[in-house]
Amino acid sequence: MDSHTVSSFQDILMRMSKMQLGSSSGDLNGMITQFESLKLYRDSLGEAVMRLGDLHSLQHRNGKWREQLGQKFEEIRWLIEEVRHKLKTTENSFEQITFMQALQLLFEVEQEIRTFSFQLI
């Protein structure tokens, strides 16, 4: 896993948690929770790829890992749309920069998860 991506996750999550978006703060907290969940999932896939022969272990531990993988891609797509929406509706430049970086990070994570999953198939 790229240490830049890890620090990007931590930086964006910290900045998002400091934002005061009024009535939408519940939505933002949900996004933060999903970002954290996505990071953990990506990390676990990366670890599985790094251990040779771990596909059998992954399948045994989670018999429906392909279904879970599909759900994670749906979550990523949903988060991308949410971040795009927030980006369009905010006028605060700090928030715009944060959401632009979050969007870029989502694209990177989607690509990493795709790469990991292809290696596991």
From Swiss-Prot:
Record carries keyword Transport: yes
InterPro entries xref list: Flu_NS2
Origin: domain of life: Viruses
UniProt xrefs under Pfam families: Flu_NS2
The keyword Mitochondrion is assigned to this record: no
Motif Nuclear export signal, chain ranges: 12-21, 85-94
Keywords carried by this UniProt record: Host nucleus, Host-virus interaction, Transport, Virion
Cited Gene3D superfamilies: 1.10.287.230, S15/NS1, RNA-binding (1.10.287.10)
GO biological process, one term: exit of virus from host cell nucleus through nuclear pore
Cellular localisation: Virion; Host nucleus
Gene Ontology CC: host cell nucleus; virion component
Assembly and oligomerization: Interacts with protein M1. May interact with host nucleoporin RAB/HRB and exportin XPO1/CRM1.
Entry similarity comment: Belongs to the influenza viruses NEP family.
Functional note: Mediates the nuclear export of encapsidated genomic RNAs (ribonucleoproteins, RNPs). Acts as an adapter between viral RNPs complexes and the nuclear export machinery of the cell. Possesses no intrinsic RNA-binding activity, but includes a C-terminal M1-binding domain. This domain is believed to allow recognition of RNPs bound to the protein M1.
Additional remarks: Average number present in a viral particle is estimated to be 130-200 molecules.
Protein name: Nuclear export protein
